Amino acid sequence: MKWKGRRQSSNVEDARGRKVATTAGAGVLLNLVGRRFGIKGILVLIVVGFVLWKVGLIDPSMMVGGPTQTQSVPVEATPEEQERFDFVTVVLADTEDVWKSELGRHGQPYPEPTLQIYRGRTQTACGAGMAQMGPFYCPADQKVYVDLGFYDELERSFQAPGDFAQAYVIAHEVGHHIQTLLGTSQKVAAMRGGPDYNEYSVRLELQADYYAGVWAHHNQRYLDTGDIEEAIRAANAIGDDAIQGRTKGRVLPHTFTHGTSEQRMRWFNKGLQSGRIEDGDTFSIPYEDLCGQFPHLNLALPSSAFRQSSYSGLGAGSLCHCSGGTSFAVSGSAT
């Protein structure tokens, strides 16, 4: 991908030097008092703490364990890490340009998300964020969170190397920001706990893949040979069936929340071909039609690319089956 020397987004928060910790506070103190003086000692401590709090001599957070605290330390980044940092800021800038234009076609503004780069652990408006979660978007603070170490995992464990594979991940998370702006995410979140929630979660994720494809469509002038293949490999590698097959040795379609490899490749490619937000409605079509046939691009994809035939007892298309056929009218259009 041709990215060096191009505009970098200013909506980037470098949190790599932040150390996040939760104060142990009362938990440790109550444990010590309980061991030494028993329940009576604990009761006395609580009463004393309450009195001191009422007269303003202590912060109440000291008695409940305290809030999450952060401490900043100097950032020491390798040249490779700093290059990745610069790269994702350019990718974010590209998404800003694309979505400002695309939503503008429909007369809507584009409030830009913030990208936070962190290491290991961070605090978000959606709760604690950890590197093990991979990149994610928090609708409560409208931020995308990325630990740059994930890209090593993407290359090593998911066999999806390349800078455009990394860009696809950012574009997918920004797709969730678009869904938040349009109200789609909120409607799906309201169904949490319902019998068909997983189905709508898959639809939501596939639409974010579609939006990543829309971004790629409008950035083709910056692509190198093989970039699209990198994104397709990444979409293939992080399908629910691919991940379950790799980690569990079997596939459980009813537990899918993000879509199969074939579905994710298909909807990214659909967005790439269209380039229009209004063609990405994954909610009004029957669930089984989310599959379709992904066009072969003569790629040297891993054998997991079309995994349906890899599992005994699963017929063609069965990985796309989900019980329930509830109508859910959510438009992917900004109009």
Regions found by a protein language model. Give the residues of each.
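Long amphipathic alpha-helical segments used for membrane anchoring, targeting, substrate engagement
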Residues: 1-76
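Short pre-active-site segment immediately N-terminal to the catalytic Zn-binding motif
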Residues: 150-168, 199-200
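Active-site recognition of the HExxH zinc-binding catalytic motif
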Residues: 99, 168-181, 209, 213, ...
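Catalytic Zn2+-binding segment of zinc metalloproteases
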Residues: 174-189, 219-220
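Short helix/loop segments within enzyme catalytic domains
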Residues: 79-110, 115, 196-199, 203-244
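A metal-dependent hydrolase signature that marks the N-terminal structural subdomain at the beginning
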Residues: 51-54, 58-127, 292-334
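Catalytic zinc-binding patch centered on the HExxH motif and its immediate surroundings
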Residues: 121-147
